[in-house]
């Protein structure tokens, strides 16, 4: 569950203000023009930006001023941030331990997640040997290995072609269902997501201008603000 209560954040001439409640396991698409506040929302939830007013509650705990590593959140950006000198398995394992000194059980988890995202045959390869879609699978696997209940994605598949985007989105939604994750995804591909999300939120000028329930699984109503 995500609750933002009276959150305010300002940077230069930009002001972000928001009250927002997202139930656990809801899948939400965040849309709007560039500079509308979409990435600011993710940064506030992840802890890369701190609110100047208001509170941020994540899974029942106040995380308004906690550090990113303390939050029940994983985040995936468009840039997959893979280390080119590490193998696929090692890049994935960073989600468990930065030291890469894994126990036998942790190594088994890497194998399991690799299988879930279709990378079991690529674990010993370097990122330079992978396609764009495969690199994003590695980055997604690393997020899943962190085993956090909230997953944030900022334009994660926009650099991929439409077929690969559809494939990655199908995989993502399947894994979210299996792991019972709460998902927020920033996107410009509105048509590709509209039938697959539970909710769509539009931002304009640092404020939520519209919240539309696409699948009424959470007993909410459509709201235009």
From Swiss-Prot:
Catalytic reaction annotation: thiamine(out) + ATP + H2O = thiamine(in) + ADP + phosphate + H(+)
Mode of membrane association: Peripheral membrane protein
Main localization category: membrane
EC number: 7.6.2.15
SMART domains referenced in this protein's UniProt entry, alphabetically: AAA
Entry binding sites for ATP: 32-39
Keywords: ATP-binding, Cell inner membrane, Cell membrane, Membrane, Nucleotide-binding, Translocase, Transport
Assembly behavior: The complex is composed of two ATP-binding proteins (ThiQ), two transmembrane proteins (ThiP) and a solute-binding protein (ThiB).
Name of the protein described by the UniProt record: Thiamine import ATP-binding protein ThiQ
């Amino acid at each position: 569950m995500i609750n933002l209560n009276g959150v305010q954040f300002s940077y230069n001439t930009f002001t972000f203000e928001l009250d927002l409640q997202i139930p656990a396991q809801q899948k939400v698409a965040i849309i709007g023009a560039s500079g509308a506040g979409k990435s600011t929302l993710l940064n506030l939830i992840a802890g890369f930006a701190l609110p100047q007013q208001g509170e941020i509650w994540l899974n029942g705990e106040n995380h308004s001023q906690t550090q990113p590593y303390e939050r029940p959140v994983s985040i995936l950006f468009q840039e997959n941030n893979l280390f080119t000198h590490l193998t696929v398995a090692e890049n994935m394992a960073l989600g468990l331990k930065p030291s890469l000194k894994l126990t036998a059980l942790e190594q088994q988890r890497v194998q399991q997640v690799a299988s879930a995202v279709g990378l079991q045959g690529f674990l010993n390869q370097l990122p330079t040997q992978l396609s764009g879609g495969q690199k994003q699978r590695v980055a997604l696997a690393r997020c899943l290995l962190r085993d956090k209940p909230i997953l944030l994605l900022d334009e994660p598949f926009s650099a991929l072609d439409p077929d690969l985007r559809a494939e990655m989105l199908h995989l993502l939604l399947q894994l979210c269902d299996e792991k019972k994750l709460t998902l927020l995804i920033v996107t410009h591909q509105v048509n590709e997501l509209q039938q697959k999300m539970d909710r769509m939120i539009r931002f304009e000028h640092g404020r939520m201008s519209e919240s539309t329930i696409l699948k009424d699984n959470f007993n909410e109503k459509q709201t235009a603000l």
